[in-house]
Amino acid sequence: MSRILFQINYDVHPEKRDEYIATAKELQAYMSGHSNHNYMVVEDKNKKNSFTEVYILKDEAEFEGMEDEMDDTVYGLTTRILSEFVVDGKTRYSTHYEIS
């Protein structure tokens, strides 16, 4: 089975950057303690305020079960990020499979 790299990319309103980063760190810390997913948030080196949420998942089953595992805290933080910080609420998703 191949691992899966799942990414969610978006741009954040510059004036809300600090508040976004605090919320993203809260989400990262929560995911670290309450999920088995390998999860991180990164910023594009060449484009300030362009962020990517990165999940490295062990297999298709873990990928397919991601939404089912969202509890109220994850849902609330994710909704806040998308509604308050993301420019025009626009996100770009990409899914990549490890070659084997």
Question: Language model features by range: what are they?
Answer:
Residues 1-2, 100:
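Absolute protein N-terminus
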Residues 4-10, 40-69:
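Short, well-ordered beta-strand segments in beta-rich or mixed alpha/beta enzyme
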Residues 11-22:
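Short, surface-exposed ligand-recognition loops at beta-strand->loop->(often short) alpha-helix junctions
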Residues 11-13, 85, 95:
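Preference for well-ordered, secondary-structure-rich cores of eukaryotic proteins
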Residues 13-15, 58-60, 100:
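Short coil/turn motifs at secondary-structure junctions
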Residues 23-31:
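Short amphipathic alpha-helix segments
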Residues 30-39, 56-92:
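An amphipathic, aromatic/His-enriched active-site/gating alpha helix that lines ligand/cofactor pockets
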Residues 92-100:
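Short, low-order "capping/linker" segments at domain edges
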